[in-house]
Structure formats: structure tokens, C-alpha cells
């Protein structure tokens, strides 16, 4: 598949909110500034979960249901975020 077709496919899929097996939930702000808060208050989600914008100035946010470590979510809430030389950030979980 040519690069341009892949980019168009990604752009078509991006606006859809999703939650994957790693516990990553991506949400789109409503442009009013409190859209993410309203999303987190629904159901059993905790408003105090760590969230960050994917890119500064963008309307997308990334929230972890466990622990946020750099740009990824750890497998469990009791994991710690550590920096590995040459590999970057990663989660360290006690068994």
C-alpha cells in the first residue's frame, strides 16, 4: 500500500475514540475545554487518572486506566515508570 493511501486510512480512523487491551483510552475534546473531564466522569472512570495531550495544542488526549509512562500506559496501576538507557521510558512492574 503506498504511503499516501496509508496516511489517508490513518486520518479516517483517528477521530474514533477507542480503548484497547492495554487500557489506553483516546478521547477527543469537545473544544470547550471540559470535554475530557465529562468523559472521565462517565461510568467508573476516575477524574484523577493521569491524562496528557498527545501533542501540545491538539484536541486529542490520552488517558490511562492504570499508570501513564511517557506516551504509553503500564499494564498495572502498581507499576513504576523508569528510564532505560538506549531504549527510553518503560514500565517496571513488581510480580
UniProtKB/Swiss-Prot annotation:
<keyword id="KW-0732">Signal</keyword>
<comment type="function">
    <text>Alpha-D-conopeptides act as non-competitive inhibitors of nicotinic acetylcholine receptors (nAChR). Through its two C-terminal domains, this homodimeric protein would bind to two nAChR allosteric sites, located outside the nAChR C-loop of the principal binding face and at the adjacent binding interface in a clockwise direction.</text>
</comment>
<protein>
    <recommendedName>
        <fullName>Alpha-conotoxin GeXXA</fullName>
    </recommendedName>
</protein>
<feature type="disulfide bond">
    <location>
        <begin position="69"/>
        <end position="81"/>
    </location>
</feature>
<keyword id="KW-0008">Acetylcholine receptor inhibiting toxin</keyword>
<feature type="propeptide">
    <location>
        <begin position="22"/>
        <end position="45"/>
    </location>
</feature>
<dbReference type="GO" id="GO:0030550">
    <property type="term" value="F:acetylcholine receptor inhibitor activity"/>
</dbReference>
<keyword id="KW-0528">Neurotoxin</keyword>
<feature type="disulfide bond">
    <location>
        <begin position="79"/>
        <end position="93"/>
    </location>
</feature>
<feature type="disulfide bond">
    <location>
        <begin position="64"/>
        <end position="73"/>
    </location>
</feature>
<keyword id="KW-0800">Toxin</keyword>
<dbReference type="GO" id="GO:0090729">
    <property type="term" value="F:toxin activity"/>
</dbReference>
<feature type="signal peptide">
    <location>
        <begin position="1"/>
        <end position="21"/>
    </location>
</feature>
<keyword id="KW-1015">Disulfide bond</keyword>
<keyword id="KW-0629">Postsynaptic neurotoxin</keyword>
<comment type="subunit">
    <text>Homodimer. Pseudo-homodimer (identical sequence, different post-translational modifications).</text>
</comment>
<keyword id="KW-0964">Secreted</keyword>
<dbReference type="GO" id="GO:0005576">
    <property type="term" value="C:extracellular region"/>
</dbReference>
<feature type="disulfide bond">
    <location>
        <begin position="74"/>
        <end position="91"/>
    </location>
</feature>
<comment type="similarity">
    <text>Belongs to the conotoxin D superfamily.</text>
</comment>
<dbReference type="GO" id="GO:0035792">
    <property type="term" value="C:host cell postsynaptic membrane"/>
</dbReference>
